[in-house]
Curated annotation (Swiss-Prot):
Residues 230-250 are annotated as: Linker. NCBIfam families: glmU (TIGR01173), PRK14354.1 (NF010934). The gene is glmU. Catalyzes the last two sequential reactions in the de novo biosynthetic pathway for UDP-N-acetylglucosamine (UDP-GlcNAc). The C-terminal domain catalyzes the transfer of acetyl group from acetyl coenzyme A to glucosamine-1-phosphate (GlcN-1-P) to produce N-acetylglucosamine-1-phosphate (GlcNAc-1-P), which is converted into UDP-GlcNAc by the transfer of uridine 5-monophosphate (from uridine 5-triphosphate), a reaction catalyzed by the N-terminal domain. It comes from Staphylococcus epidermidis (strain ATCC 35984 / DSM 28319 / BCRC 17069 / CCUG 31568 / BM 3577 / RP62A). This is Bifunctional protein GlmU.
């Protein structure tokens, strides 16, 4: 059976009080609508249509060709939004999942279970529900005395007894696709808001003797809809708890989960320890037995086994086995550290290969460079890579010793097993096995200050 999905992402999100459109606000480092799309895909859906309106181009830029798109010019309610997918889905057979783009905590497992329940019961519509102590703002699930679904009533249209019901609609549905688009034509807007409600499709199906089911999830957090900054923070907290719990259950020590932020695409090996205040995001892979020190930030990087990261910032870089970074170091994009490398305090590395066993221990800048095996870069040494218009490369061979406060004026090559005297400014290539001195001779003028 074919499976389709419609993601509702057209709303502006006025309560967010933001220039950014609601579904593009991030949770765990990723736009909410992207979380939704990823889980819809994992649920086994064949075709996705995203309904866009406010911020249409920004949403399309975020999701790219992972989805088809239909434009909702005026936001006239959820049924009206779903109807916009007519051009892509109206003539299709199968099941159509409808999901709101502001529900970043929904999991693919729950969506899978909803679809499977819908198809196994041969229903025309199945609604995903949950129970909560505080159902304010959600549509209520109304059942008859036999527990069978009768209708869904929105908060603003509910009477006092209906508002007291704790089982709520998530706004997520599975429909028989042909029935969905047939009934959408019959939905009216005679309600308090003057909008076309998607739950009215369910009422029309029941009125015509169709079959409606409810699938209840036990995790209310999954269906949280984010409408304001407070709910955004609640969603962030809930997703971080879920992510951190997953890693701890799989052998990672997180000393203070409440202050540790890990993205959904991060992979972490067993026996790695993460201290408080750490942020790890993007497509980062951390292997086994790594120590991530407090307040470190790592994005889109690979950290190999037994590395030790101390209070440092690492972006788009590779850190080798048994390598130490920090404290207070920065690896900028394109940094590649080999095994048993030391990059120490207040060192900045950018677009550089630092080979196995090399050391850059203090107060240095290494940019657009290649540093050979076991070479030592002295304190305060820098590669001077930029002339105001272009950047140039510095190559330092293996087993070299670069004295403190050395300036390597690129482009320049320093051979294997060389020694550069402290305080030198190197402008010419240095042959291997050489000593290079490039500094003015010291002159003492005795008694000068007594004049």
């Amino acid at each position: 059976m074919q499976r389709h999905a419609i993601i509702l992402a057209a709303g502006k999100g006025t309560r967010m009080k933001s220039k950014k459109y609601k579904v593009l606000h991030e949770v765990a480092g990723k736009p909410m609508v992207e979380h939704v799309l990823n889980n819809v895909k994992q649920a086994g859906v064949d075709q996705i249509v995203t309904i866009i309106g406010h911020g249409a181009e920004s949403v399309k830029d975020t999701l790219g060709n992972q989805s088809l798109y239909s434009f909702q010019d005026k936001q006239l309610g959820t049924a009206h939004a779903v109807k916009m997918a007519h051009e892509h889905l109206a003539d299709k057979e199968g099941t159509t999942l409808v999901v709101c783009g502001d529900t970043p905590l929904i999991t693919y497992q729950t969506l899978q279970s909803l679809i499977e329940h819908h198809e196994s019961t041969q229903s025309h519509v199945t609604v995903l529900s949950a129970s909560t102590i505080n159902p304010y703002g959600y549509g209520r699930i109304i059942r008859n005395h036999n527990g069978i679904l009768e209708r869904i009533v929105e908060e603003k249209d509910a009477n006092d007894s209906e508002r007291a019901i704790k089982e709520i609609s998530s706004g997520i549905f599975a429909f028989n696709n042909r029935v969905l688009f047939e009934k959408l034509e019959q939905v009216k807007n005679d309600n308090a808001q003057g909008e076309y409600y998607l739950p009215d499709v369910l009422s029309l199906i029941l009125k015509d003797g169709g079959k409606a089911e409810v699938y209840c999830t036990e995790d209310f957090d999954e269906i949280i809809g984010v409408n304001d900054r407070l709910m955004l923070s609640e969603a962030e907290k809930a997703l971080q708890q879920r992510i951190n719990r997953y890693h701890m259950e799989n052998g990672v020590t997180i000393i203070d989960p409440s202050s540790t932020f890990i993205g959904t695409d991060v992979k972490i090996g067993i026996d790695t320890t993460i201290e408080p205040g750490v942020r790890i995001g993007g497509h980062t892979t951390i292997e086994e037995d790594v120590w991530i020190g407090q307040y470190s930030e790592i994005n889109n990087s690979t950290i190999h086994s037994n590395a030790n990261i101390k209070q440092s910032v690492i972006n788009d870089s590779i850190v080798g086995e048994n390598t130490t970074v920090g404290p207070f170091a920065q690896l900028r994009p394109g940094s590649n550290l080999g095994s048993e490398v030391k990059v120490g305090n207040f060192v900045e590395v950018k677009k550089a290969d630092i080979k196995d066993g090399a050391k850059v221990s203090h107060l240095s800048y290494i940019g657009d460079a290649e540093i050979g095996e076991r070479t030592n870069i002295g304190c305060g040494s820098i590669t001077v890579n930029y002339d105001g218009a272009n950047k140039f490369k510095t190559i330092v061979g293996k087993d070299a010793f670069i004295g403190c406060n050395t300036n390597l004026i690129a482009p320049v090559t320093v051979g294997n097993h060389t020694l550069i005297a402290a305080g030198s400014t190197i402008t010419d290539n240095i042959p291997e096995d050489s000593l290079a001195l490039a500094r003015a001779r010291q002159v003492n003028k005795e008694g000068y200050l007594k004049k």
